[in-house]
């Protein structure tokens, strides 16, 4: 039976050398729709598949009211639930009467920027990929992201009592996620 040292050498002999490179990728997504008061829409996506999410910028923008200066703007809520356990929300507001009502969810430093351009030994590319993508403290934002848009309050668009030709509002959600994508290539036995 081989000694422990001989077994370790055999394992090392089967290891292969891989070059590790992380490339920045900008993932953009846009959705739009129409919601009436009390309705919600749920959108699911997985922006960080095969990489690490670094930064998130998202904005929900509502269409303008028919008479924007006379009537209150509609109130919507944008919420985000990540599979990794982080949840947040933002309610629409209008900072300037010349701009559309909007809500934003922004967050930087979701994970740290990984080092790039080095080599590692491993038995397989798949094992190395699993190891690097699942490092402790670097898994924020992995898995499915669930966006929910809710029309909380949609005031009438005309000042005439009981008449509301538009009982909701059109909306657009724009999401940009900076992801560092892992690229592994074998460079030697």
Predicted features and spans:
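Single conserved hydrophobic/aromatic residue that forms the stacking wall/gate
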Residues: 1-11
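A short linear-motif detector with a strong N-terminal bias
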Residues: 2-3, 36-38, 58, 125-128
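A generic signature of intrinsically disordered, low-complexity regions enriched in glycine/proline
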Residues: 7, 78, 85, 127, ...
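Short N-terminal edge-element motif at the start of the domain
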Residues: 12-50
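Short linear interaction motif-like sites in intrinsically disordered regions of transcription factors
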Residues: 23, 32, 87, 146-148, ...
């Amino acid at each position: 039976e081989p000694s422990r040292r001989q077994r370790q050498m055999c394992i090392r002999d089967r290891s292969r050398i891989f070059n590790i490179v992380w490339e920045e990728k900008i993932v953009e997504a846009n959705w739009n729709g129409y919601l009436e008061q009390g309705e919600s829409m749920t959108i699911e996506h997985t922006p960080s598949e095969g990489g690490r999410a670094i930064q998130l910028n998202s904005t929900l923008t509502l269409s303008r009211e028919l008479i924007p200066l006379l009537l209150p703007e509609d109130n919507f809520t944008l919420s985000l639930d990540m599979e990794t356990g982080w949840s947040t929300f933002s309610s629409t507001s209008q900072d300037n009467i010349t701009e559309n009502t909007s809500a934003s969810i922004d967050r930087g430093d979701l994970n740290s920027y990984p080092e790039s351009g080095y080599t590692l030994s491993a038995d397989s590319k798949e094992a190395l990929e699993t190891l690097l993508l699942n490092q402790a403290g670097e898994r924020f934002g992995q898995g499915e992201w669930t966006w929910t848009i809710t029309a909380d309050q949609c005031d009438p668009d005309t000042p005439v009592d009981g008449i509301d030709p538009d009982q909701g509002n059109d909306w657009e959600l724009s999401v940009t996620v900076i992801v560092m994508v892992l690229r592994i290539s074998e460079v030697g036995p």
